[in-house]
């Protein structure tokens, strides 16, 4: 992270402005002397704690830009964790309700993190795995036409943000 990035990090009005301002650390003992320079990108420095903050912010802002996510909408998504945390954080900052569908075998701690951002959770049966979680989210979406589902696994904004910023 450059001095300029550090200065920017100290002048932001909300946590979303910090997404992606993650430092690089040179790994000095990974390659032989006079070898390649190897760096690690510390995505854990994102406000929600993972690289998934990038995709959550990107998918929501892309939907806003395209006019399919409007004030008062609810974001719904199937998740196993970090994307859900990112969406819960983005929703909290931007004022959206967030409903996250996850397997019943997800930890209570993970659910508490989501709920601390104001998100609601709906549990799917563990034996159906992620496919069952996605199906349950799609059923809820069909019943609530004002909901928006980012569809992280099919959303072009997901890989695009990595190409642009990671």
What is each of the regions a protein language model found here?
Residues 1-166:
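PLP-dependent amino-acid enzyme catalytic core
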């Amino acid at each position: 992270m450059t001095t300029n990035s550090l200065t920017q990090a100290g002048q932001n009005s909300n946590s979303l402005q910090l997404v992606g301002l993650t430092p690089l650390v040179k790994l000095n003992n990974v390659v032989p002397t006079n070898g390649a320079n190897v760096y690690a990108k510390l995505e854990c420095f994102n406000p929600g704690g993972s690289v998934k903050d990038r995709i959550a912010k990107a998918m929501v802002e892309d939907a806003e830009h395209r006019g399919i996510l409007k004030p008062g909408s609810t974001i719904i998504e199937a998740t196993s964790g970090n994307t859900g945390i990112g969406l819960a954080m983005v929703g909290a900052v931007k004022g959206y309700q967030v409903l996250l569908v996850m397997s019943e075998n997800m930890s209570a701690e993970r659910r508490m993190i989501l709920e601390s951002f104001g998100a609601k959770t709906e549990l799917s049966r563990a034996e159906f795995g992620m496919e069952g979680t996605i199906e349950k989210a799609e059923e809820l979406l069909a019943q609530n036409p004002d909901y928006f589902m980012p569809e992280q696994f099919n959303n072009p904004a997901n890989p695009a943000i990595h190409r642009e910023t990671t």
